[in-house]
Amino acid sequence: YAITAGIPGTDDPTGPDEYGYFAYDSTDLGYSSTPVYEWMELDPEGGNLLGNVFLSQDDSVMTIPLPFTFRFYGVDYISVTMSTNGWISFIPTDQSDFYNCYIPAALGPYAMVAGYWDDLKGMKTGVDESGNPIFADMRIIYWYDSANNRYIIEWNKAYNQYTIDLGPAASMEKFQIILYPKQEQDGDIVIQYHTVDNPGITTNYCTVGIEDHNQLRGLTYTHANTYPVTATTLTPGLALKFTTTWPDNYVANEDETLPIPVCNLRNYPNPFNPVTTISFTAKQKG
């Protein structure tokens, strides 16, 4: 027999991937894991004197120690590499990887969280005598919120290469990746979008998602301006949460007369499958 379980929508979480990560967004109402958009400005230019600032014009990375151990895809990490191109990696790297691709794939950084993976730069302010572009500094601000035991990384004044020649009118991306460690569990990852555009028509747009240390498992929220049926288009004020916490209405039911437990679960397909087919064989005729 085959049963096709119901049609999911944008108010449902995306996933799981092969490891068990789901992506909840702030429009997934009715789930305990749904994130709430709560922007906390880190940039000292915005009045917060706590954030540390990494300045770069283009294609740079910086590796910093974490104040806690963070488990991701079952592996414990103690540092994070931040890239000007909108991602972090838990494995130190000197590669900035500006060319985004689908997740998972054997390209780009390992053990990655792509908050807004695309070719990002500081604002273009002119050209030099040789005709080379001149960029202002992009700002990456990072801070440990000890009161809430979370680590926040913010990208500010990050301009999209696709519209970079527009100068101050170019598309600016301002977003945060927030790490929440858990005791002896995979940590939660929240991404918040303060200002966001996705203009790269000919450059795969941006990629948002997570990927493991072997680049074999991952969960894409969006790539090439394509979204799973359960995802919401990136907009200002959107929050995402990547977590291994299953939806509240997941029910496992064991029956002693059956050799294998049966699980009842609302349809949570992998990113681009609109339905789930459950196949089974009855032990005897009913």
Placement of each model-derived feature along the sequence:
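Glycine-centered coil/turn sites that cap beta-strands in beta-rich domains
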Residues: E254-Y268, F272-G286
